[in-house]
Amino acid sequence: MDSKHVTESTSGQEDIQKTWWKEAIIYQIYPRSFQDSDGDGIGDLNGITSRLDYIQSLGVDIIWLNPIFLSPNDDNGYDISDYREIMREFGTMEDFDRLLKEIHKREMRLVLDLVVNHTSDEHPWFEEARKSRHNPYYNYYHWWPAEKGEPPLRLSYFDEEG
């Protein structure tokens, strides 16, 4: 099956473009362990930016970043508490903007690991939802009823106690 498609350019000539999401070389980065730029032992956005030439030299088309959003880090960054903030140890929104600009300068793309199927228990939606069954955020979550007189069952693949 041919994974290329043809588009017509503004000049009227046909352009053949790669179907980027099918044919691209994707380089996944777990920011925490990739490259530390400030000596604190934690990888960060500026560290990733500093290695873009190397990544590009590998023939990479897309960089896929694991979660970088604000998180209490109980679930390796997948427990996001604010989708509008960068995890402080990774840098700032300005660092992210610079990283994105530098990626685009090298004609690469960026894919973010956007975790929308669950949040941190510290996320404002969850904090509101747990207040009442009538709260507007209550149905954002799936709630499991507790046995009478028992705490709710809490399942976690990462927590040995729960």
Model features per residue range: what roles?
Residues 2-162:
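Acidic/aromatic-lined carbohydrate-recognition and catalytic surfaces
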